[in-house]
Amino acid sequence: LVVTRARIRLPHPGLQATVDVLKAADLSDDEVQRMAAQYVRYCDAQNRVAPAGDPYAERLARLTGRYVAVNGIPLNFKVYKTTAVNAFATADGSIRVFSGLMDRLGDDELMAIVGHEMGHVRNHDTIGAMRKAYLASAARSALGAVGGALGALSASQLGSIAEQYASAQFSQGQETL
């Protein structure tokens, strides 16, 4: 049996559960990095990115300029111009900082957040989140195979793996150093 990375929907939920378990077991760092790069391109297109020369971009570049890679993964930093207070990192080394966060923090505090995000890249936390997403999908598919009320609830799949990935929160274990 060869399982590819294409997201396919099989007619029987039990088969889909098997495929998702196999995907979770076979997921590689390289594959997660490719998916992360696609996700970041999408996010960058959906947000106002501070251009070179923007005060936010210059501040972040000044603070992060010496950090070029973590465990061989090239880092790239950008600022999203929004009032939201957030920052995130993805498996491909992309780190995005929101201007609303930058407005509230001094340089040392901001670098503590950036360092924290770099830790997610270093620890390969995204691959664990993706494995959990595939296993959750497998569990929903398995419930769908049962039929009845559980099957009907599972039939909606309670969201896709992409949604889980996009909204994945790192566990407390991943948040501690």
Question: What spans do the regions from the language model cover?
Answer:
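A Zn2+-metalloprotease active-site environment signal
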Residues: L1-L177
